[in-house]
Design a protein with these regions (language model features):
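Short glycine/proline- and acidic residue-enriched helix-loop micro-motifs
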Residues: 105-126
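Acidic, low-complexity terminal tails and accessory targeting/binding regions
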Residues: 1-4, 85-97, 140-146, 161-202
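Short, conserved phosphate/pyrophosphate- and ester-handling motifs at nucleotide-, phospho-/glycolipid
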Residues: 11, 152
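Glycine-rich N-terminal loop/short-helix segment of MobA-like nucleotidyltransferase
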Residues: 14-27
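A short, N-terminal amphipathic alpha-helix
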Residues: 34-51, 136-138, 185-187
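GST superfamily/GST-like fold recognition
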Residues: 153-157
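Short beta-strand scaffold positions
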Residues: 55-56, 129, 150-151
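Phosphate-coordination/substrate-recognition cap region in phosphate-metabolizing enzymes
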Residues: 40-106
Length: 202
């Protein structure tokens, strides 16, 4: 069976990660460690050889993708619809801070995170609806090849659920953590298959 491989990668570390703050659609830069992670990802890309490099339009994703694209002699193709879920009033806050400001909304979000957005935020289901067509177009462009997509923690997990036919509200329980610059590989052919999850770039 002929397979197209998608390498889904979370961007490198940002200053908000150490504090466990929800970055969402906020345009937060990488830390020095995040830049180093991006360089290690480029080493992985050199040995793996994806045919295309794509990223969210947010700077933390683009800066993570750029070293890999340079190493491969490619340009980064940005897509605004691959940006992270917008967490509304939760942007920049820790979960503890959210519990103090809007506890009921946080509880609903944690119970069914794809259906219940944080106040003034975006539903996970709507994020899937905007991002999945982009992913499908990338698959069509790289039929029987491969592509590297630099994304964000929540959107990446939502897309894994959608691609694999998993109920999207389960993204937290099934995929509790995606490490910065770790690679999750989905094989797309007659069926979808998870070929690797959260693998550090070697």
């Amino acid at each position: 069976m002929k397979v197209t491989k998608l390498y889904l990668v979370r961007h490198g570390q940002t200053i908000w990660h150490a504090e466990n703050r929800y970055a969402g659609s906020s345009d937060i830069a990488l830390t020095a460690d995040g830049e180093d992670e991006a360089e290690r990802l480029a080493g992985w890309a050199t040995s793996t050889g994806p045919d295309g490099v794509y990223s969210s339009s947010l700077v933390r994703a683009r800066r993570t993708a750029e070293p890999s694209a340079r190493a491969l002699g490619l340009d980064v193709v940005e897509h605004h619809d691959l940006r992270e879920v917008d967490f509304g009033q939760g942007e920049g806050l820790t979960r503890g801070e959210m519990a103090g400001r809007f506890p009921d909304a946080l509880d609903a979000f944690l119970r069914a995170p794809a259906e219940n957005p944080l106040p003034s935020g975006e539903r996970g289901l709507d994020a899937i609806a905007r991002a999945r067509p982009v992913v499908d177009d990338i698959v069509a462009q790289h039929r029987e090849g491969s592509a590297l997509l630099v994304l964000h923690s929540t959107l990446l997990r939502l897309l894994l659920c959608d691609l694999l036919g998993i109920e999207p509200n389960r993204y937290r329980s099934l995929f509790p953590r995606v490490a910065n610059c770790a690679v999750s590989t989905v094989g797309i052919g007659e069926t979808m298959a998870l070929l690797g999850l959260n693998v550090p770039p070697a």
